[in-house]
Amino acid sequence: MNQEITNNPFNPLTPPKVFDEIKVSLASPERILSWSYGEIKKPETINYRTFKPERDGLFCARIFGPIKDYECLCGKYKRMKYRGVVCEKCGVEVTLQKVRRERMGHIELAAPVAHIWFLKSLPSRIGLMLDMTLRDLERVLYFENYVVIEPGLTDLQYGQMMTEEEYMDAQDAYGMDAFTANIGAEAIREMLAAIDLEAEAEHLRAELAEATGELKPKKIIKRLKVVESFLESGNRPEWMIMTVIPVIPPELRPLVPLDGGRFATSDLNDLYRRVINRNNRLKRLIELRAPDIIVRNEKRMLQESVDALFDNGRRGRVITGANKRPLKSLSDMLKGKQGRFRQNLLGKRVDFSGRSVIVTGPELKLHQCGLPKKMALELFKPFIYSRLEAKGLSSTVKQAKKLVEKERPEVWDILDEVIREHPVMLNRAPTLHRLGIQAFEPTLIEGKAIQLHPLVCSAFNADFDGDQMAVHVPLSLEAQLEARVLMMSTNNVLSPANGAPIIVPSQDMILGLYYLTLEREGMKGEGKIFGNLDEVQHALDAGEVHLHSKVTVRVPQIDEEGNEVFQRFETTPGRARLGSLLPKNAKAPFELVNRLLRKREVQQVIDTVYRYCGQKESVIFCDQIMTMGFREAFKAGISFGKDDMVIPDNKWTIVDDTRDQVKDFEQQYMDGLITQGEKYNKVVDAWSKCNDKLTEAMMSTISAVKKAEDGSDMEPNSVYMMAHSGARGSVTQMRQLGGMRGLMAKPNGDIIETPVISNFKEGLTVLEYFNSTHGARKGLSDTALKTANSGYLTRRLVDVAQDCIVREHDCGTERAITAETAVNDGEVVASLGERILGRVAADDVKRPGTEEVLLAAGQLIDERMADTIEEAGVQSMRIRSPLTCESEEGVCAMCYGRDLARGTMVNSGEAVGIIAAQSIGEPGTQLTMRTFHIGGVAQGGQQSFLEASQEGKIVFENTNTLTNANGEVLTIGRNMKLIIQDEHGEERSSHKLGYGTKLFVKEGQEVKRGDKLFEWDPYTLPIIAEKPGTAKYVDLVSGLAVREETDDATGMTQKIVIDWRAAPKGSDLKPEIILVGDDGEPVRNSLGNPLTYPMSVDAILSCEDGQKIEAGDVVARIPREGAKTKDITGGLPRVAELFEARRPKDHAIIAEIDGYVRFGRDYKNKRRISIEPADESMEAVEYMVPKGKHIPVVEGDFVQKGDYIMDGNPAPHDILSIMGVEALANYMIDEVQDVYRLQGVKINDKHIEVIVRQMLQKWEISDSGETTLLKGEHVDKQEFDAANEKALARGKRPAQGEPILLGITKASLQTRSFISAASFQETTRVLTEASVQGKKDKLVGLKENVIVGRLIPAGTGGATQQVRHIAASRDNVVLEARREEAEAAAALAAPMADDAADADFLVETPESRD
């Protein structure tokens, strides 16, 4: 009886098995037999009349255990008292039925069979071990070819393939016993068994040392890796060929009788039956000594059936069941969304949960939710039962159940008690970030819908149009505590993505607050003075003063010392009312609300209150302004009718002007002054400018203050109020209602030239309506795709970052990154203050121009600090970053900085990787799916000039200009910069000047804000003559390299360079224009090189052959469509492309060294560019560029490391290898942020840094030295360092390597944890690899731990782990002390026997009574 208690799974007395790591390896036949409880000999399952399992069949009770608890099959022994007895009649052990879930069987195969995973999973492990190709292997295994195993003295080769005839001939030629050749899996098994791994490894290493060429070393390295992994893991190669097959327990492949005498069965039973049938038939054939050919066929069929069992459809035909559906094999059980990993281990259904529709609950407090009584009764049943018993209202659970079912009144009282202070968790699918699950205290409500507090809607992304939410009940005390302390909605005021409050009013509340804080001239009661806030309220109630009138009010304020003082404010009664809600704090003065509050301002107010007044105050404040917002919006009664949409009076004049402009462009095109593409660009531009003008006119009309008869201001237009306050609608939508709809896009992203001129108020014409449907439909189909894509991106990000946890406080690294203001096209997009907020300073920051230290290294920068640094005018500073953190696992708190959701230093154990992944993935659905071509013209025209954003002095860098005949200054350098400096000579802004830019300012000139600095042609890239001379065409052969295009519309001809390589005769042409002087010699530049202008495809020639040219004249123009303004891959695809680290199609070429450009010999249709290093000791570097691509450098140009030699998007790998980790990080951060900024989404840089850190974990070995690492292998930095330390300790040469950038999918599949990788993608491949290498999973990440069913090592789970470690170490100390004491006692006891008795009490310490 006693033993029984310990075996009961629900009994806590038995300690669960504790383990630290999981190892997976190949199973040897002996291992398989040791698991097995018996061999399965028959394919039968159960007897269909008695429903009893057949003996020796797939469900045999003798092997797997009894069908009923404690009862043998024939019924001879029943009940507990016989437990452990084996019945002599039916051979069944009397025990729990549960053992049928854990006992395995086996099948002895009559012939060995290859395991398909090791055969077909690429690269084929068996093939690599034997150095055979997969085709040859399959021929041997499926009995088509013989293979020579022992050549003997014949001239055959080991491993040589022979057909049946060749085998016969060889036997005739050499005699039967002269050599051994075999066929089938036996042959392969013999060959594998014969391999001596150590000798093989030695041999391969020796070969590798000698191997030359490209492919050979690669192949040897691959084989060497496999051999090494077998050596290290202790696996034997012949175990990849199976002689015994394990059979999984019957309860895991159940057979369920349906009504009507039929059975539902798992597909595995069918697959096993095929194997057993064929195996038995094969045994019989071998016994009967059947002809070879029949036996062989049977063996092949056996091989195929085992293949199907392990991985159906991997090879040959898919085996289907009776219903033509492919059978689910063992591999399919693990794979995919429905597989074991993702369906059962990572995502489970939970008890004590329910779901219902949500409705709004405006009278709830922020920490409450309304729970329907019916749901609560069901969810809290166990608590109610126990409470009923405790109160003595029921004596048994059955009685309690009856009471609850009848819904007696006392049950409701008890439910109230139970629910008090017991938080529940609410979840809205899709849970895109951690705020998708929050805890609330339930209040019971009638009805059937859950009530949700309006302020948390934005966190859940919920609305009340029929959304459903799920409720979960945390049961244990610990779970309730965590829900209350960590997940309560009041603890999640700030968003983890950017640290801004996420509990902000929206829609109605914003409209109410906006209306409340309006100020209007001439309202009733203007100029009155009130002594305190109560007086204001009385006057409002009495109707003596209007909400919006200008009055003076005395408001109590807190000064710096914390004393209450009265201050007078010019304000309105509405603002005074709002001010009365503010917490009393010096940092939250009345000025905070004494202004017109729009959405941004409200968020700012909440942020300030949260930062300075603490959490409790701010939560109360949020609740109060929500109530006030709703009430005021309701009292204001703002609504809108058709007349609220105002059409500006001058609409048609603006439209007609634009029409005239467009006519001009058409005419210019007819006259051949501009190309079709340029015309299109200009027309689109003109219309978007027209749209902007119209919008401005409309906004100024609609926002203008109108006066009533009595001279008081009228209420603002209600549509304007809604849009302006940020409650609903936007300027774009108002423009469509009252201006013009504007330009429409085709589904492929192109913009239709003819805009929709009508607005919705006037109504669209049929044609306009048709144009509109085009893009609208695309928008809808986009949305559906977007959700799936965004979800997949999040999943990949989570997978790559899941094991990034804060593991220590400080890693003590010296490294850091530089933070500076982010500037995009000369406009500041993120100030330095924003970027350094919540980071730790790496070096002391000094006030510019002085030695005063503003903040010391190692300090966390808070809001005040950031402001101080901004005001001091610091340009850049060094900050700690997760990228440079040197922690072994995860990151350290100092490198990470502030936990954005709490506003304090990040805690140890915070899962920052997952937070980063969620922050980047969650806004994914808001991003667009589209790829914009011509850089987003719909967003308003191409910028073609730049104005000074600051005032200061102009300084040029790398000046290279010339003045043309009209006296205009043009830049002809490639890397010229224009810098604006302040009076201290500090750089305020810098702009790169493109080739052909026209300058309006001179060196040293003082500029004011808004002065025009320079302009350029946004649509074409000019090629400018540097010296005067005569143009001479070279190789510009008409018809081959140039086509004369006569425009049908204009009758004008233009010369356009075409792709000369396409023509058969044109392959060796080099089309260019050279300048010759009067003497017929080419004009040379300052370096003495002749001035030649190579032409690229699509260039338009602007000069005739033999034409006189002045310096600064345009020789040719390249349309920007040819020299693309980078194809802007917008939105989600761009983010995915960046994180997957894909090489862009025409990626830019980056100079690897400083040096001078030389053009080398051309090769086929590539141009050879080499850089001669300025530093003599370095090698020259060569690049091949496709001909006809525009190359922005010319012969003899000096380029610096990191300059672009060919335009385009750079490949992130190049940035890493040439310019280092920090440059890569900056590139990634800027590019990702650009995409999100376009949608107005704020994400903190550190999240992107965390992901980039995870992408940079691996090192690629460039030279293996004398270590065990192999060239080209990807290893973790730690493994790399460890291997090198080992080598150095032995005095050997260390390996060389460099960090390598992996895309997130690759990085996830290459994590150290094979369990995590297998649950992500390509399950079979990962597991095959892991088992061959005998990989160990140390269970450090979150995913592995969830899968094996323990607490995750982050958050409270991490704390539990630490406590366990401490306890274990203390136990060790105690045990150690006890051992020493025992030894001392033994030493004392040795000389005098009588003292031994006294020595015993020494050992008796309190700890030893465990």
Swiss-Prot record:
Residues involved in Zn(2+) 1 binding: 72, 74, 87, 90
Substrates-to-products reaction catalysed: RNA(n) + a ribonucleoside 5'-triphosphate = RNA(n+1) + diphosphate
Residues in the signal sequence: none
Binding residue positions for Mg(2+): 463, 465, 467
Keyword check for Nucleotidyltransferase: yes
InterPro entries recorded: DNA-dir_RpoC_beta_prime, DNA-dir_RpoC_beta_prime_bact, RNA_pol_asu, RNA_pol_N, RNA_pol_Rpb1_1, RNA_pol_Rpb1_3, RNA_pol_Rpb1_3_sf, RNA_pol_Rpb1_4
Pfam families: RNA_pol_Rpb1_1, RNA_pol_Rpb1_2, RNA_pol_Rpb1_3, RNA_pol_Rpb1_4, RNA_pol_Rpb1_5
Recorded GO CC terms: DNA-directed RNA polymerase complex
GO terms for biological process, alphabetical: DNA-templated transcription
GO molecular function terms listed in the Swiss-Prot or TrEMBL record: DNA binding; DNA-directed RNA polymerase activity; magnesium ion binding; zinc ion binding
Domain of life according to the entry: Bacteria
The enzyme's E.C. designation: 2.7.7.6
Summary of the function given for this chain in its UniProt record: DNA-dependent RNA polymerase catalyzes the transcription of DNA into RNA using the four ribonucleoside triphosphates as substrates.
Family under the similarity heading: Belongs to the RNA polymerase beta' chain family.
Subunit structure: The RNAP catalytic core consists of 2 alpha, 1 beta, 1 beta' and 1 omega subunit. When a sigma factor is associated with the core the holoenzyme is formed, which can initiate transcription.
Protein name per the record: DNA-directed RNA polymerase subunit beta'
